[in-house]
């Protein structure tokens, strides 16, 4: 389960626009928002791309994308 709060913070801190991130991911802005709200899950290739775009370390990746018991 994705820690959407932490991911949203990383996006805000990066200064990148969600439209730009969605375009780089090859999905619509709505598709990205569905993932950020927990309606749909990120797939491995999307996680890798987000980590590259946002400069997320492997340690932070685990906290954001693979923590158990994370609240939506």
Regions found by a protein language model. Give the residues of each.
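DNA major-groove recognition helix of helix-turn-helix/homeodomain DNA-binding modules
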Residues: 45-60
């Amino acid at each position: 389960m994705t820690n959407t709060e932490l991911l949203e913070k990383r996006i805000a801190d990066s200064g990148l626009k969600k439209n730009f991130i969605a375009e780089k991911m090859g999905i619509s802005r709505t598709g990205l928002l569905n993932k950020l709200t927990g309606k749909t899950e990120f797939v491995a290739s999307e996680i890798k791309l987000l980590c590259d775009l946002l400069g997320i370390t492997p340690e932070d990746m685990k906290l954001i994308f693979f923590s158990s018991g994370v609240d939506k």
